[in-house]
Amino acid sequence: RGLGDVYKRQLYECQGDMILIDCGLVFPDADMFGVDLVIPDFTYVLENRDRIKGLFITHGHEDHIGSLPYLLKKFNVPIYAAKLTIGLIKNKLEEHGLASSAIFHEIRPRQKVTLGCFTVEPIHVNHSIPDSLAFAIDCPAGAVIHTGDFKVDYTPLSGDAVTDLPTIAEYGRKGVLALLADSTNAERPGFTATEQTVAEGVRRLFVKAGKRRIIVATFASNIYRVQQIIDLAIESGRKVAVSGRSMVSNTEMARELGYLHAPDNVLITIDEINKYPPEKVVLITTGSQGEPLSALSRMAQASHRQVRVGPNDFIIISARPIPGNEKTVTKVVNGLLTLGAEVIYENMYDTHVSGHACQEEQKLMLTLAHPQFFLPVHGEFKQLKRHADTA
């Protein structure tokens, strides 16, 4: 259960026991008037709550954790996730008054968890956020590999490791009943670019900015990208401020847990940015998807309380628009350009790389796992179909 789109939630059932994988949401299509969020139908889960042993989370992106508050209000299922993912979930649950009552179990790669007839082994994978996991799920019916969102980055950023292909291959040799694999980039040939590409692309843009203030918009959960920006700010002698509620809470949490490294003498508050000349400031902000109430959107509308955008600003949108968000992103870009800023967006420079496997990485996963059955997941039907064709 849970296939056919890009916001993820799956339920595995064997011999009367059940486990859940992920609990995501998506934003509505343009024609879904009056709808703020799209969440899963939890009816089957709630009807079988006594049989559900736990909920495993692959990583901390919205399309994998965003619906947790709505499930936990009705069913306080135990959550199994990596350390950073738990931190991101807690930030989200704080907004709903649920953080103190949620039941968390921290998991790590290669440390197996047995719940009912299921034995689940977390496997490290590369993605655009630290602590991303695949799961090998052993049960009486056989072994299932659930990749979650993944790519294979052979030159990962400092602190990360290459996707654990040997463990995938080990399961392949033993025998894999089914592989459920990320289909997001199934239409793209070749390999996904390394995160190192972004570091070099953004470094060139920092030079291009000259004496202007730099504003970088990215996903608040993209801890890798935030670290890259902080490192470049230090290289160029700039102070760093963050704007946007989720960006502030996530950066604070990631620093506390040791996933984000930023010296105290580099960080300043948003209220302090005007105390420094433009060439001494980098502002990291939310709003890369043109969200109406995000910090970057408010800047584009000249309604941000602390930031007034003008000709002295060099703005980098370090993310590609999620399908369906193109118009809102364009509106924000137009607003920023109207105010006199220079804006770098989409494919103008190497400011973003995908966190998802392209066709050659998908072939590698299929070859190593060597499953009896293959279920493409995490994609629109055309992507699922292309992934099936690749297999």
Describe the predicted segments one by one.
Residues 1-56, 61-276, 294-308, 327-331:
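His/Asp/Glu-rich metal-coordinating catalytic cores
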Residues 231, 235, 254-391:
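C-terminal regulatory/interaction regions
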